[in-house]
């Protein structure tokens, strides 16, 4: 018999992955505690470290993404080493309030990937960021970790993830 999950709720109240020099953890806690409107107001006035509000109409979204996101992610693709690529990958993120709208994470990720893969010709191209969506404690992989596609010493594309014990590589199919 399956447990009745509808009667149980888990609430996360600590943020572990975000850098100490940004307020993304504060942002998440504000939204989770019902202070979303207050958070948006602060975001629009530049009150949070490491977060920038980009208001744009849907018609201009692709141009903004091309100028800001795609240009940054191309720098990751062109990095001279895995270490440089990983450092660059931490400098910029696109956060979306929704998943399945024209300006949601699915559409934005697809646009960025299509812009970057025209040259690469594969789904797992050098410089692609991969989000871990499950927990595998024995492998030190946790939901929300971000990996980076990069070739190993033999030229085989791997997804590299920084863990508490250092960099680890996995085959993209995993």
Which residues does each predicted region cover?
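Conserved helicase motor core of P-loop NTPases
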Residues: 1-130, 136-139
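Conserved nucleotide-binding/hydrolysis modules and their immediate coupling elements
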Residues: 110-174
């Amino acid at each position: 018999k399956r447990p009745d999950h509808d009667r149980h709720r888990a609430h996360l109240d600590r943020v572990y992955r975000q850098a100490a020099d940004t307020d993304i953890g504060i942002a998440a806690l504000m939204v989770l505690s019902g202070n979303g409107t207050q958070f948006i107001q602060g975001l629009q006035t530049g009150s949070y470290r490491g977060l920038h509000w980009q208001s744009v109409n849907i018609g201009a979204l692709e141009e903004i993404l091309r100028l800001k996101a795609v240009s940054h992610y191309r720098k990751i693709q062109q990095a001279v080493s895995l270490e440089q690529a990983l450092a660059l990958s931490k400098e910029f993120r696109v956060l979306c309030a929704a998943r399945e709208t024209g300006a949601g994470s699915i559409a934005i990720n697809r646009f960025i990937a299509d812009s970057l893969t025209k040259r690469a010709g594969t789904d797992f191209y050098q410089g692609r960021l991969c989000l871990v969506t499950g927990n595998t404690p024995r492998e030190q992989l946790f939901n929300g970790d971000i990996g980076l596609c990069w070739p190993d010493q033999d030229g085989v594309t791997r997804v590299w993830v920084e863990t508490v014990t250092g960099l680890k590589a996995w085959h993209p199919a995993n």
